[in-house]
A protein has these predicted regions:
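Compositionally biased terminal segments of proteins
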Residues: 1-184
């Protein structure tokens, strides 16, 4: 993590946001351990701004935690903790093989293993979403400096292949080419 260039107030805000997300995930895990005393383990895949915060890629406030995949048994707890599972509509913004690139969230848990999608998968999904805050998220040095551009090219092709109309496909390709030109 490169906090060197952040002023003290932004560092404090970042630490508070990161700690809030981590504490929520740890509490969810603790509650799941109370509900289920078996040896079963569960998973939750986090995406969006919260994933980028957990990966030390962005340093802004995010109001929600989004999950695109989770074990069915923990879904009532996710709902209780206001972890948004309604982003499954955006699952088409992720290549089919995104699970092959999952990154474990480095927190100690007993029952629930938390993951984020890869940085490349997050960039593709945010290029698909095409909102101003999404562009801001993926234009930080922490995101752009270590991207695997060959993988990015393939992921863009995979997502475009699954798009329903030519307009969305062309729009994504143009956004990606612009992004690539500015940050590669």
């Amino acid at each position: 993590m490169s906090l060197f260039f952040l002023d003290n107030s932004r560092i404090k805000l970042y630490n508070k946001i990161n700690n809030t997300i981590i504490e929520k995930l740890k509490q969810l895990d603790s509650d799941m351990a109370l509900i289920d005393s078996t040896d079963d383990l569960y998973t939750c895949v986090i995406v969006g701004g919260s994933a980028l915060v957990l990966m030390d890629k962005i340093f802004r406030s995010t109001h929600d935690i989004d999950s695109i995949a989770s074990s069915e048994k923990i879904q009532p707890l996710l709902e209780a903790y206001n972890i948004n599972m309604n982003v499954k509509a955006y699952l088409t913004n992720f290549p089919d093989d995104y699970r092959e690139r999952l990154v474990p969230v480095e927190i100690e848990t007993k029952k629930v293993k938390f993951y984020t999608v890869s940085t490349e998968d997050l960039v593709v999904s945010k290029l698909c979403a095409s909102r101003d805050k999404d562009f801001e998220d993926i234009e930080t040095k922490e995101v752009t400096e270590n991207l695997n551009w060959k993988l990015m090219d393939r992921l863009i092709e995979d997502v475009c292949y699954g798009m329903l109309n030519e307009y969305d496909e062309n729009h994504l390709r143009m956004r990606y080419e612009d992004y690539k030109e500015r940050f590669m």
